[in-house]
Amino acid sequence: IGAVRDSQSCHVELICDGVHVHPSVIRATFAMFGAERVILISDSMRATGLEDGEYTLGGQPVVVKGNLATLHDGTIAGSATNLMDCMRFVVKNAGISLEDAVMCATENPAREIGIFDQTGSIEEGKKADFVLLDKELNIVGIYIDGKEQSC
């Protein structure tokens, strides 16, 4: 937090899976830095989207239950939550606006790694990769290169 506060060119990366960071800390971070300096990340491991069970992460056995991956001693090993679920969590549980959550999951990361001229927003000349959401923030459409994909 201190490094980001001291450097205007840094972003805060928040794991918003409902395990790593409490909603009150999410709200405080947005209030302190503004949505323009927050990047949502998932800390997602390769077992994300698979059934609960035992998997390997970095050569270590991990147990996945719900959206959490732990070592056998209970230590958090990572998340089994995708970025869409993280975005949904900040909106529904931390009270962050949908517009800010989308910016933090798309535009801000693209700017940070220097590819905002290609992706990160829906604009002419950019990659047309996006999802359509319903009012409950469920994915109802997926588009890659402007072509609808099956959900």
Residues covered by each model-derived region:
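Short, Lys/Arg- and Gly-enriched loop/turn segments at beta-strand edges
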Residues: 136-143
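Glycine-rich nucleotide phosphate-binding loop and flanking beta-alpha elements
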Residues: 20-21, 139
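His/Asp/Glu-enriched, well-ordered alpha-helical/loop segment
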Residues: 2-18, 25-133
